[in-house]
Regions:
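Alpha-helical scaffold/interaction cores of sigma-54-like transcription cofactors
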Residues: 1-527, 531, 536
Length: 536
């Protein structure tokens, strides 16, 4: 097991999950800043119950709260608050939004701590923050709500810090200190900027569009306690309001560590197989399957042939021993309902070696005349679930049949993550730097043939081969010379290789499970329509 600390904030560019005033959102215009329309919230699972509630909140934020962005509200949070810890997040959080609202006539870079010197501004801001704190305490309890300090070069962040320090002093709500993390280490800032630009490759882009280090507003990467203290000291030297708050900040840094290692228990993701429920008090799932198989044996005239009877008994005995009757019933019902809507292939692979599959109409091949073995498909010696391979002319007909049988909430299409593979990544980075396409293509074309035989032999790889930068540097002279000629390309390839590029819908993958089991799984929806749902 491992400790899982999940941040529902994500990055500013990716939206995130929000606490939002829906009425204000509906009245807002396109000209209003983002921080006036939705807010981030950090939610941490401190135990297994909390992890399930966090997954439920994510699911509901997409399925029931989607309005431009996935959202939750106080009521939803309170209903699923057990086992959760909440903090106020970064400058995109609700606390910051309530502060900045007071200065709506200013640009973001004009927000600074000394704006709170005026009581005409200070009092209404603190009143809003106290009301916000009361609502969060009501949702998750006083021991599970924290005010979040961050230390960076944004003057608006120091404005937020000033208000939250005062709020903590007044209410006793504890502070924590965190670091927004948009890239892994301080030297990876340029790779992140390039990563963002790669999503816009349709536009005319070149390396001049990458900012210089001194142009960055802040360096957002994970920091240890000593680095956090150094960041605070820089702010301490710049802003007077930090004077006298040293002990508060030191405690906040230590408290962040304590939350992870003392308040959060070990949690795990349940990866066990969940099948739809079959059977009734009068008839078990295995009895249902047995009746279907016996009826088919009689219908096909096989019940009088001893070799078929023995094979049927062997297979049914193994199925009962392994507890797989629900799997075969589910496959039977899906195929039976969809058979008039689409064409099926005869079946292929080891599944064609099952007489039960043939009798249920899942495959169209009688395995006995061809000597096909049941043991290659299933047996008591096998620890993995059976895998039936067949072809269907209409994928959606199968999915629709599954929805009719088990319900929309029990049939969820699967998402997949598109990653930055080596050859396409090299081409994209080279394009960004204006390197001639012919030169790049000449180098990348033969890479697979040059590298794969050597790399697979050295690494003893038997799985699908994936080109890696280090293997290409070792076994491809053309690749090595290209990287020596254009070192900036190689530098970014090492950092960005296999990073997620986008999320999409798997071409055919579908999860079928009881809705009550899916409740504990993190569900993401791109739209309220179940057909468009994505499971993560």
């Amino acid at each position: 097991t491992q400790k899982i600390v999940i941040d529902a904030e994500n990055e500013v560019e990716q939206g995130g999950h929000v606490i939002e005033d829906e009425e204000e959102t509906k009245r807002s215009s396109a000209n209003k800043p983002e921080w006036k329309r939705y807010y981030h919230l950090v939610v941490i699972a401190k135990n297994q119950v909390g992890l399930g509630n966090l997954f439920t909140l994510v699911k509901k934020s997409y399925k029931h709260g989607f309005y431009r962005f996935p959202r939750i509200d106080y009521k939803m949070l309170k209903e699923h608050s057990e086992g959760l810890i909440v903090s106020t997040a970064c400058v995109g959080g609700l606390a910051s939004g309530l502060i900045y609202r007071q200065f709506s006539g200013l640009r973001f870079d004009e927000l600074r701590p000394d704006l709170m010197n005026s009581l005409d501004d200070y009092n209404p801001v603190m009143s809003r923050l106290e009301n916000m704190a009361d609502q969060f305490v009501d949702c998750v309890g006083r021991d599970n709500f924290f005010l979040e300090l961050q230390f960076n070069d944004l003057s608006a962040q120091h404005l937020t810090n000033r208000c939250l320090i005062d709020l903590s002093t007044k209410t006793g709500i504890p502070l924590i200190a965190t670091a927004d993390s948009h890239f892994p280490t301080s030297d990876k800032w340029q790779a992140r900027e390039l990563y963002k630009k790669l999503g816009w490759m349709g536009a005319k882009l070149d390396q001049s569009m990458l900012p210089k280090k001194e142009e960055l507003k802040c360096m957002l990467y994970p920091k240890n306690a000593a680095q956090m203290w150094d960041e605070f000291k820089q702010g301490h030297n710049q802003y007077d309001f930090y004077h006298g708050s040293e002990e508060l900040v030191r405690d906040a840094i230590e408290r962040t560590h304590d939350i992870t290692w003392q308040k959060c228990e070990d949690t795990w993701i349940d990866t066990s197989v969940k099948l739809p429920h079959f059977g009734t008090p009068e008839k078990s799932a295995f009895r249902m399957l047995s009746d279907l198989v016996k009826e088919a044996m009689i219908r096909e005239g096989l019940a009088v042939k001893p070799v078929y009877v023995e094979r049927m008994k062997e297979e049914m005995s193994d199925i009962k021993y392994l507890g797989y009757e629900a799997y075969f019933l589910a496959m039977y019902k899906i195929f039976h309902l969809a058979e008039n809507r689409t064409l099926f292939g005869p079946g292929r692979g080891s599944g064609a070696g099952s007489l039960v599959n043939y009798l249920l109409g899942i495959t169209q091949i009688d395995p006995l005349p061809y000597g096909l073995l049941w043991s290659r498909f299933l047996g008591r010696h096998r620890t993995s679930w059976p895998d039936i391979d067949t072809d269907a002319g209409d994928r959606d007909a199968l999915i629709d049949a599954s929805r009719e049988l088990f319900g929309d909430d029990a049939v969820i299409p699967v998402s997949n993550f598109n990653t930055l593979k080596l050859k396409s990544l090299v081409k994209d980075i080279a394009k960004f730097y204006g390197i001639n396409f012919t030169e790049v293509n000449k180098m990348t074309g033969p890479l697979q043939d040059e590298v794969m035989p050597h790399a697979k032999d050295e690494n003893q790889e038997k799985s699908v081969f994936v080109l890696k930068h280090e293997d290409c540097m070792k076994y491809s002279k053309g690749y090595r010379e290209f990287m020596e000629k254009y070192p900036e390309v190689g530098k970014h390839v090492e950092t960005l290789f296999m990073e997620n590029r986008s999320i999409g819908r798997h071409a055919g993958g579908v999860i079928i499970a009881p809705p009550e089991d899916l409740e504990s799984t993190c569900l993401l929806y791109t739209s309220p329509s179940p057909r468009d749902g994505l499971l993560s």
